[in-house]
Amino acid sequence: MLILAGLGLYDENDMTLKTLKFAKKAEKIYAEFYTAVLTGTTTEKIEEVLGKKIHVLSRKDVEYNGYKLIEEAKDKDIMFLTAGDPMVATTHVDLAIEAKKKGIEVLIINAPSIYSAVGITGLQLYKFGKTTSIVFPEENYFPETPYNVIKENLERGLHTLCLLDIRIDENEKRFMTANEGLKVLLELENRKKEGIINEDTKAVVVARAGSLKPKLVYGKIKDLINYDFGEPLHCIIIPGKLHFMEEDALKYLCENI
């Protein structure tokens, strides 16, 4: 059996009792921390809670050698752990599909993810439109997708969740800050010039969602862009049309600057 289980958002205390139960039954436990990462803990602390060794896989291991993991699950209980919810990343969905194709039983254990955690802002989840990702710009690479998604969502009165780039491999460990993400959005406006985003556009920044002390800050981009949000992970929300209760939530649940 292949067990796909989420670890939640922040530390080793976020995993469910169900994950703990099946981890104790699993013959081998794998994990990946390149699509998302728990910044409030370490692999060693998670191993201590589970009472078992975790074999951490790289992006290359999962994307090119994932079939080996599936082969093991033919006659063993194999657990694959991820930060957040296990079915958010398409790579994990692909593992589940391929296992099913081979007649292998698949158990999915859901967990808190950023998609549910943004509810701490008080913004109504059903009013979020398409999610987008803001990545680190590179030479000859400056994706316009975030700008286009925000534009489409705003036209429909919907909020936009902007996930920020994570770079984790053997040579690099880098998390995009909300400040960097906001600068990218302003640069996209400078290039596109469609009047969608400017320094007076209001945004919400969520830092360390899932922790006991998350940071929620609401204000204009010009005020947020130099604010110190502290340790990662960060995300940005561009609100759409606000219900009066959402306005109250942003006023009382977030720090207003």
From Swiss-Prot:
Catalytic activity, as annotated: 2-[(3S)-amino-3-carboxypropyl]-L-histidyl-[translation elongation factor 2] + 3 S-adenosyl-L-methionine = diphthine-[translation elongation factor 2] + 3 S-adenosyl-L-homocysteine + 3 H(+)
Pfam families membership: TP_methylase
Gene Ontology molecular function: any one: diphthine synthase activity
Ligand binding (S-adenosyl-L-methionine): 9, 85, 88, 113-114, 164, 209, 234
InterPro entries: 4pyrrol_Mease, 4pyrrol_Methylase_sf, 4pyrrole_Mease_sub1, 4pyrrole_Mease_sub2, Dphthn_synthase
CDD domains for this protein: DHP5_DphB
Biochemical pathway: Protein modification; peptidyl-diphthamide biosynthesis
Family per similarity comment: Belongs to the diphthine synthase family.
Protein name (database record): Diphthine synthase
Source organism (scientific name): Methanocaldococcus jannaschii (strain ATCC 43067 / DSM 2661 / JAL-1 / JCM 10045 / NBRC 100440)
